[in-house]
Amino acid sequence: MEGLTYKYYKKNNSKNIYLIIHGGGPVGVETDFISAIFDTIAKTHNSALCFNFPYCERREESSSGPDLLEEVSTLKQVIDFIHTEGYNRITIIAKSLGGIISGYYFAKYPDKSIDLIILGYIPNEVKQNAISDNLKLVIQGENDRFAAPSEVHKIVGNKVAVIEIKNADHSYQNHNKEPIYQNEVLDHLVNWI
């Protein structure tokens, strides 16, 4: 975890941790939505951890490149840290780019013991074959520019729950770019936990 900006809520005696992976852009864990996910998970009496990828620390808009080498290496470092903390169950909650990075991670480091939730699935970018044993839930906006929930369901199959957020875009905002559907996403996460 050296060199990373992160938030870590360690619930005493908890064997479950939720690892929250932010989406694209230079803000990372400081976005209101990622912070709200972190706070919501902490209220469920589970441990939670979220961190910035190095490109955020450099205030860059984009990830390290098409193979996401730096991001996969960083995610491995974080998951290794989580294992040393003694957790029995790891669930990744990945927003958008975080889902893509998770796919690259599982392609390189398969681990069926880690569950994956994707908030805003991006077809043709997510390595579905690499995450097929991990993916449990997708929460997708009805008006997501990358794929409608029905398209996502066709890709991920019947073993994965796909929840549609009516009228929401990829960031769970309305047509005026107001994030009015993000609380609905948080409610679905809590119900799933």
What is the meaning of each model-derived region?
Residues 21-24, 119, 165:
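Alpha/beta-hydrolase
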Residues 132, 137-140, 144:
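Short beta-strand/loop motif that positions the catalytic acidic residue
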